[in-house]
Amino acid sequence: QARNVSLVRDVIQEEDAGVRSRTVEITRDGKKHLFGVIEIPSFYFDYRSRRAGTEYRSVSEDTAKAFESLKAKKVEGVLVDLRNDPGGSLEEVARMLGQVIKSGPVVQIRDGNGNVNVFEDTDGGEQIYAGPMAVLVNLASASASEIYSAAIQDYERGIIIGSTTTGKGTAQVQLDSLAHGQATLTQRKFYQIGRASCRERVFAG
């Protein structure tokens, strides 16, 4: 006999989709060199858990731990891998850039009315990692990935390696309080500190 069963889908926690780090040893001219690699799948931030007042994950905290771990292993440089990273939280990319630069603006956001909001490094000059670094990108690196790469380039903090990026250039606002779910609206464009739109200027190594 057939019957109807109602199921409510819970939030899926993608535990394997967080920041990962590792070391790579390279031998050159008979001398061994140790480098670090940090893989960032997206600029994630658990807004729901933060609003609920419970423990939450964020890419900036996970990346900070990765930098500290690699520093303890005395790596000679770090490669930040942003390949296939579609982007994510603007606040998180600003926090992450604060880990590798001393201070300053990191991106400009302009809305349809011409209002400009500048996101800055707000950690008071604290720099978790000051060593040599590079950023690896590809065609699927978009949005926050491009903001991160652009700021690294603007501050001459490291080199950009890889293919041309997406060139997305737009930012979204998420509405969570709708009666039947959520909606994401594209309302803004983001610009490098040098005023170039990332839709007009994509990044390639």
PLM feature spans:
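Short hydrophobic-aromatic micro-motifs
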Residues: 36-38, 184-185, 199
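Residue-level detector of conserved catalytic or cofactor/ligand-binding positions
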Residues: 192-204
